[in-house]
Amino acid sequence: APYNDLEAVEKLFDTWGSGIAAVIVEPVGANMGVVPPKKDFLEGLRRLCTENGSLLIFDEVITGFRLARGGAQEYFGIQADLTTYGKIIGGGMPVGAYGGRRDIMEVVSPVGQVYQAGTLSGNPVAMAAGLTQLRYLNAHPEVYTHLEALGERLYGGMEKLCQELKLPYQINHVGSLGCMFFTEQPVVDYTSAKSSDTKAFAAYFRYMLDHGIYLASSQFEAMFLSDAHTDEQVDETLSIMRNYFERTVQNA
């Protein structure tokens, strides 16, 4: 089913009911740019899964420990049954993890009968780095206040820029995650994201790179703000963006 299309998911449940083992979803679509969930979308998925005895599985590799200490589940107030994690939990080291309800996790060894192992599982260097990272976030909740403020400053500034210059582009953002889609169409799913002008994005990316701002090189990747970023750096980024788009408008 398409992201943000609760009706399509409902039709699948009408057809298959409890035969659906799980619904797997990014709570914020972050691998097609950034696509926030529509109002009641995640809540609707939670309701359908509960009613049919299906698992709700959140892919929080990107949103986990970024939107909030409790990830998107804390941010939106929706609890998943299982969750996958990566990126931030490694403190800069490669790591992946999953977790969830006790009754599900107890099916996995050594408590349960489902065996899971890997040559690099529990790598001590990655575990030490990740544990240090999570302890820091636990002790410094102000990190999230700072990230939210940076997000509002950058993405709000981009929205203002588009309004002032009458640019027909879409600024999608949730917390410190954001994306400028080079399309007139509101972006709510993969299909609408694909309506973006990738050639226009490529020209924008090249200009920003030439002026010292290294963005993700694909229209369909998210922008990530870090606690290390400053208001001054955000303002510099917005200034360079303005210079580019003012030139673009003049040359149109």
For each predicted feature, which ranges?
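Conserved N-terminal phosphate-binding loop of PLP-dependent enzymes in the Aspartate aminotransferase
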Residues: A1-A252
